[in-house]
Amino acid sequence: XTLSEPEPTCSIEYFRYQAIEDCEYSISVK
């Protein structure tokens, strides 16, 4: 990915761009 296109799933790379809380939120929504 890239910063312009964050992955829909929570991944290590995603943590670099978004806070862990946001990552967990994405999982809950999905």
Curated annotation (Swiss-Prot):
GO terms of biological process kind: proteolysis
GO molecular function, one term: toxin activity
Transmembrane portions of the chain: none
Keyword RNA-binding: no
Cellular component, GO, one term: extracellular region
Cofactor(s) for this UniProt protein: Ca(2+)
Enzyme class: hydrolase
Cellular location(s): Secreted
EC code(s) of this entry: 3.4.-.-
Record key words, sorted: Calcium, Fibrinogenolytic toxin, Fibrinolytic toxin, Hemostasis impairing toxin, Hydrolase, Metalloprotease, Platelet aggregation inhibiting toxin, Protease, Secreted, Toxin
Protein role: Cleaves fibrinogen Aalpha (FGA), gamma (FGG) and Bbeta (FGB) chains. Degrades cross-linked fibrin. Has no amidolytic, plasminogenolytic or caseinolytic activity. Inhibits platelet aggregation induced by collagen (IC(50)=7.5ug/ml) and various other agonists, presumably via activation of a nitridergic pathway. Inhibition is accompanied by reduced ATP release from and surface expression of SELP and CD63 on platelets as well as increased intracellular levels of Ca(2+), cGMP and nitric oxide synthase activity.
Record's protein name: Hementerin
